[in-house]
């Protein structure tokens, strides 16, 4: 049976020049991490530290959390799958959100329930009566709380949410956590995109880890440090007993020596994060108004990506001009008129607009950069 791959980044079967389907850092992997990974290759004749203790200590220092609460993994995906196997049953997530949660839950034999929008099409009327998805954070949290009952064993909350860009406050997440604790459910907050934001320090749930045993926080080097091909992530766990059960689902030596060394090097490069956030702010300001002139609707949230609506065949038409974008019809609550692009470097974003103009036949932006 053929594997049904629905995520972005499939450049291997799509001959393209520009990949806007993934949300990795356009600055590329930090130079120190590249050098560390090269040094790690020389050491690959030995087994990696199966505990990844040096990496865990580096993460603990950077995030001010106990090193013994950190579970390293071969990217966030491996940790999600281990979590799905450890806590089988019914999980709850907002809709739309990252499709990997449902895949991990299904692989563990569980079921996914969604707190979606108000009608069957995933749309609700806004204050002006227009047909529009409701992505505002408090609206989403209210729907999630209404759906959370004692049938739920695990709640996933992506912050900021992929693909909508909705950013949730600590107060909102703590309300979800309080109800989940009362229902004996766990809450996994996915913060893989949070380091892209200046708001990281005020929105991360990592400081609450030791106070709430039902809290888990998922992070990855994949997106923020552009290590998608190297694979490195971690799950911070408030419950030490649950942590042991999750570890039991993982293979030994699941993080390579090059990945461990690259991760340690990345955490020491604070200038890289500052440059990343500066680039994102500038390029979001460049892309949003231009996209709004060319597509049906743009949802300007947080994170290094943009969700928008247009004609269903836009992905195929963009492939014809050498650009891969993420079609979002497989996201719960969205249809084939929704698309997502990663926010790239300025030159790449300029080229994206030029090629979108070519596809749309719109000359308004033809001579603008």
Q: Whereabouts are the PLM-identified features?
A:
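Conserved PLP-anchoring active-site segment centered on the Schiff-base-forming lysine
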Residues: 84-106, 111, 117-118, 132
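PLP-dependent enzyme catalytic core of the Aspartate aminotransferase-like
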Residues: 320, 330-369
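Conserved PLP-binding catalytic core of the aspartate aminotransferase-like
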Residues: 281, 293-322
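Active-site phosphate-binding strand-loop segment of PLP-dependent enzymes
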Residues: 120-197
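Helix C-cap/helix->beta junction micro-motif
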Residues: 108, 182-183, 212, 294
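PLP-dependent aminotransferase class I/II
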Residues: 29-30, 214-298
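Short loop-beta-helix segment that forms the pyridoxal 5′-phosphate
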Residues: 48, 60-82
């Amino acid at each position: 049976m053929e594997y049904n791959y629905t995520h972005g980044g499939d450049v291997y079967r799509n001959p393209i020049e520009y990949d806007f389907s993934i949300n990795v850092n356009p600055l590329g992997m930090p130079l120190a991490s590249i050098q560390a990974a090269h040094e790690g290759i020389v050491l690959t004749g030995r087994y990696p530290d199966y505990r990844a203790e040096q990496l865990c200590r580096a993460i603990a220092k950077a995030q001010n959390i106990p090193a013994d609460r950190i579970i390293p993994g071969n990217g966030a995906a491996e940790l999600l799958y281990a979590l799905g196997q450890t806590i089988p049953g019914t999980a709850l997530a907002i809709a739309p959100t990252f499709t990997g949660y449902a895949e991990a839950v299904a692989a563990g034999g569980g079921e996914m329930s969604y707190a979606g929008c108000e009608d069957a099409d995933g749309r609700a009327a806004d204050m002006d009566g227009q047909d529009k998805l409701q992505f505002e954070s408090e609206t989403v949290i209210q729907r999630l709380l209404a759906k959370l009952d004692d049938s739920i064993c695990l709640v996933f909350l992506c912050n900021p949410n992929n693909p909508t860009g909705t950013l949730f406050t600590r107060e909102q997440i703590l309300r979800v956590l309080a109800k989940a604790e009362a229902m004996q459910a766990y809450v996994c907050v996915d913060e893989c995109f949070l380091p892209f934001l200046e708001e990281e320090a005020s929105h991360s749930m990592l400081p609450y880890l030791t106070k709430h045993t039902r809290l888990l926080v998922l992070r990855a080097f994949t997106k923020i440090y552009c290590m998608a091909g190297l694979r490195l992530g971690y799950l911070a766990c408030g419950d030490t007993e649950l942590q042991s059960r999750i570890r039991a689902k993982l293979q030994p030596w699941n993080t390579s020596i090059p990945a461990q060394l690259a991760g340690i090097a990345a955490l020491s490069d604070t200038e890289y994060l500052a440059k990343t956030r500066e680039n994102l702010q500038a390029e979001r300001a460049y892309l949003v108004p231009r996209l709004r002139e060319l597509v049906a609707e743009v949802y300007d949230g947080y994170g290094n990506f943009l969700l928008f609506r247009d004609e269903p065949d836009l992905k195929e038409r963009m492939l014809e001009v050498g650009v891969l974008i993420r079609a979002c019809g497989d996201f719960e609550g969205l249809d084939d008129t929704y698309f997502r692009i990663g926010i790239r470097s300025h030159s790449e974003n300029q080229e994206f607009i030029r090629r979108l103009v070519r596809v749309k036949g719109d000359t308004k932006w033809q001579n603008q950069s």
